[in-house]
Each structure stands twice: as structure tokens, then as C-alpha cells.
């Protein structure tokens, strides 16, 4: 990337995150006036200065890591879909579209955006709630309007004797703290100490039409643990995913990397139980990571 383009992106990112020139200059060990001249294109940015500025900005990011619920699949031992929708989820059933098909062998479902509640005439199947990534973000907005949190919702799920089929916890790295290609190389060399015995690292190849065909233009993904197990990690360069899906330049992506903890069945239940008991999503997520890696 040319100097002028790099410093333009740097300044835009600094301002978008509300970080002052004074703060960046102090951390980078340069004067505010010097940084001003760099950002206005009056002076060229050397490779050494570029690295110092990038490191300073990374240090000053507000909340460089944030955690969110990114997937929920829960089965309720009841056939009363209205109770689940209106009393537990606190949505209006009349606002949901009813479809005469479902997933996971359910016969029908109620849909509101990406929020899906599935039903079946078979009592043992009960009512199934599925929220994928977009569904979680949409339901988060409803929770905000209801003055509730995920923890309060999960506590209600437990009261309903819900069976947790899958829960994903996602840690967004906004500052590029995780060096995923480096982690992939460490695993390839057998230098990763983990309870897991399975590692899979690869680079996505869907970027050839957007960037030059070389490894540097591809996003790295690392799976720690078997994808067939009830617990595994997926770590990937989210910025490259946004480049492919939305055409957002890597340097402009709000989230650089993502660390996903994917839990199924009993693993999902115990994670939710810990989350509800401690009321600290961060402690639950990093506790799982520290236990297995």
C-alpha cells in the first residue's frame, strides 16, 4: 500500500475510534506536530514509523476484544410454541410468518427475520429455537428493547428445562491482536500445547477475483479440535471474510479477527450454566480457552 493511502486509512481509523493525535503521538514516542504533518501528507511515512503508529493505534483501541453470542440452538420440552414465543422470547406471535416446513426434521416453523422457532406434532421433539449469527444480532435488539440481557434469557431457558443443542461464543478482535497465520504455523510445526489432538489450518481461496493470487491475499483459518466433537475452536481472519462477502477492504474492516468457541449438547449446557452463575461472559469464554489451549 502506498504511503499516502496507508496514512489516509490510518487517520480514518483513528478518528472513527475516537482516538486523539495527542494520544497516538504519546504512545508512538513522536510529537503531535510530527504526526499532524504525517497525516496531512506533508511528510512521508517510513516503514519504521508506520510500524510504530500501527502498534500505538492497536494499544489505544477502545475495547479491542469484545465477546458476543453468535449462535443458539435450544430445544424446549413443550409443544406450546405460543408460550415459548410470547412468554419466554417475549415476541408477538402474530408478527411471525408461519411456514409449513422446518429444519432438523421439524414440520413447521415461525419466522421473524432470521429468528426461527420450529414445531413438530411429535411430543419428544418439542419446540426448537435457532438463532444464527444474524438472528442473534436481531434478537439482541429485541433484548435491548425488553431491558433484558442474554444472561437473563438463558436463566429463563434453564427454568424452562431447555436442552441446549449448540451455543457459539465469539470473541471479536478489533485491533488485530491475534496473528492467525503465525498460530497456524505454530500448529503445523507441532508447537501448540493443547488438550485437543486435532488441528486444521488453511487459507480461504475465494479472493482470487478480488486480489492478486498469492498467499498474502488469502484469509487464514485455524480449527483447534475436531469439528465432529462437542467442543472446538474456530479462529479466522474476519476482515478477509468481509472482503469476499461485502467487498470491504481489509484495512477498513471493523473486526480484524474472530475467535469462535463452538459448544454442543452437555458442553453447551455447562457453558450456559457457568455464564448464568457467574454473570461474566468473558470469564466463561476465557475459562474455556485456558482449559483447552
Placement of each model-derived feature along the sequence:
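Alpha-helix N-cap/N′ positions at the starts of helices
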Residues: 5-6, 30, 48
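Short basic helix-loop element that most often maps to the first helix and adjoining turn
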Residues: 8-27
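A generic structural-conservation signal
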Residues: 23, 34, 61-63
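DNA major-groove recognition helix of helix-turn-helix/homeodomain DNA-binding modules
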Residues: 47-62
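Short glycine/serine/threonine/alanine-rich loop segments
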Residues: 19, 30, 59
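Structured, helix-rich domain cores that form ligand/interaction pockets
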Residues: 2-5, 12, 16, 58-293
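Recognition helix of helix-turn-helix/homeodomain-like DNA-binding domains
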Residues: 29-45
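N-terminal flexible/basic segments that precede or flank functional cores
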Residues: 1-2, 42, 53
Amino acid at each position: 500500500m502506498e504511503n499516502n493511502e496507508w496514512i489516509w486509512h490510518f487517520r480514518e481509523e483513528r478518528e472513527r475510534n475516537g482516538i486523539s493525535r495527542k494520544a497516538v503521538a504519546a504512545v508512538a514516542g513522536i510529537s503531535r506536530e510530527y504526526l499532524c504533518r504525517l497525516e496531512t501528507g506533508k511528510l512521508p511515512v517510513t516503514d519504521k514509523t508506520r510500524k510504530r503508529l500501527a502498534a500505538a493505534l492497536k494499544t489505544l483501541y477502545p475495547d479491542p476484544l469484545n465477546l458476543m453470542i453468535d449462535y443458539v440452538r435450544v430445544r424446549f420440552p413443550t409443544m406450546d410454541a405460543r408460550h415459548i414465543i410470547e412468554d419466554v422470547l417475549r415476541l408477538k406471535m402474530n408478527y411471525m410468518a408461519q411456514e409449513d416446513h422446518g429444519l432438523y426434521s421439524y414440520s413447521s416453523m415461525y419466522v421473524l427475520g432470521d429468528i426461527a422457532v420450529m414445531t413438530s406434532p411429535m411430543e419428544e421433539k418439542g419446540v426448537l429455537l435457532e438463532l444464527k449469527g444474524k438472528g442473534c444480532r436481531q434478537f439482541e435488539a429485541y433484548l435491548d428493547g425488553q431491558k433484558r440481557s442474554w444472561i437473563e434469557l438463558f436463566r429463563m431457558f434453564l427454568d424452562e428445562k431447555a436442552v441446549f443443542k449448540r451455543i457459539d461464543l465469539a470473541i471479536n478482535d478489533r485491533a488485530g491482536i491475534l496473528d492467525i497465520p503465525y498460530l497456524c504455523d505454530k500448529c503445523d510445526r507441532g508447537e501448540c500445547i493443547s488438550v485437543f489432538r486435532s488441528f486444521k489450518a488453511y487459507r480461504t481461496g475465494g479472493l482470487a477475483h478480488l486480489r492478486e493470487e498469492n498467499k498474502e491475499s488469502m484469509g487464514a483459518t485455524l480449527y483447534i479440535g475436531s469439528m465432529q466433537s462437542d467442543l472446538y475452536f474456530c479462529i479466522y481472519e474476519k476482515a478477509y471474510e468481509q472482503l469476499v462477502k461485502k467487498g470491504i477492504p481489509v484495512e477498513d474492516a471493523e473486526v480484524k479477527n474472530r475467535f469462535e468457541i463452538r459448544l454442543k449438547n452437555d458442553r453447551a449446557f455447562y457453558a450456559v450454566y457457568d455464564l448464568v452463575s457467574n454473570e461474566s461472559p468473558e470469564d466463561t469464554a476465557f475459562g474455556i480457552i485456558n482449559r483447552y489451549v
